[in-house]
Amino acid sequence: MTSQKTILLSFDVEEFDLPCEYGFAISKDEQMLVGMQGTLAMQKILTQMDVPATLFTTASFAETWPTMMQQLATKHEVASHSYYHTDFKNEDLLL
């Protein structure tokens, strides 16, 4: 008898805002571009391995890259990760 092992994968698919959290200025355009480049690299690996994942995205990132997000949603679960969390406010949680 063979037992099948399962793993659940989730990724943050968002703007690259980590430098901002440490006081370094990075433009929103650059944040979005770096986030998109990382997302494409992740997507390539998941596609090669034929592995689904849950992708937590900010609405701001999804609005910037709607075509890519629609494409990702055909194979992966896409979930909310607030509107924009660099300068997190309670309003970011509102629908």
Residue ranges and their predicted role:
Residues 1-95:
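Catalytic alpha-helical scaffold of carbohydrate-active enzymes acting on polysaccharides/glycoconjugates
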